[in-house]
Amino acid sequence: MAVNNQLVNQDNKKPSVGATIATFLSGEAVKKNIADVVGKTNSTRFVTSIVSAVQNTPALKECTNVSIFSAALLGQGLELSPSPQLGQFYMVPFEDKKAGIKQATFVLGYKGYIQLAIRSGQYKRLNVMAIKEGELQYFDPLSEEISVNLMVDNWDAREKAKTIGYYAFFELTNGFKKAMYWSIDQMINHADKYSPAFSKNATNGKYPKVSYADYLAGNYDKKDAWLYSSFWYKDFDGMAYKTMLRQLIGKWGPMSISMQNAFAADNAVVDQNGFPVTYPEQEEAEMPTVDTTATEETVQEQQAPDQQQDINDILFN
């Protein structure tokens, strides 16, 4: 995957007012680049996915077009969809204060990890799930033996039950098995340690935050909601699943070249060749809020007429 240097040079500055992603994608050099990388038959779907992603995350409109394009091309190269409804990968806005611009980072979702693992053909079974209160009987970290009594007779009650931990497991086609269990406290501590955008305890900095427990209880000023825009606040389970898979596969699982590239680029601003340039802190990220019950096809079917016309103009004019 490569972005023409001409595209980088034309976008190596703050996005100007009105310089929309549609305008950028309509350039002859960009259209040629798209056709060369994804093929003419896939161009419409690719452009549609970018436009839809930008509409779902308005803050992306303030990002450099090349950073959006590069992240989207990387996802395309991995054969993953940027649709927030599918949760395979996201393009997340990041404010680069040193450069004075906003850039889009490539963020792999846990469903993207699963897709890449399945496609490798080396995983016979792969699963990750939340363990609810009352379900865990025991877990031996040495033997990795676990005993759970899942509430399979009442999934509605299970959905509402308190999460006490997370379990991930894989079995390879050659019979090798590996499993992990983390308590909810382990996961919260992990997020607190590695995510600058998440705080387990209350903070008193320039922008004070309430503790995570108070956030869950709704004990925070709603005008400060932007302080809690990290996925660790908006979708803790999703981030926990991703963390479990990344820990499990990264340490013990075989990884294809595609998965290695995805691991390396995760949470990074990527360059024109899909390689990570920087791993920004995500305090400024505005995460998309979507209806996860929707499908990618539904999103495309419900596109506004002017959006579809923009796409037609981009590809065929």
Language model: regions and residue ranges:
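Binding-interface segments
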Residues: 16-255
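Glycine- and charge-rich intrinsically disordered segments
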Residues: 1-32, 260-317
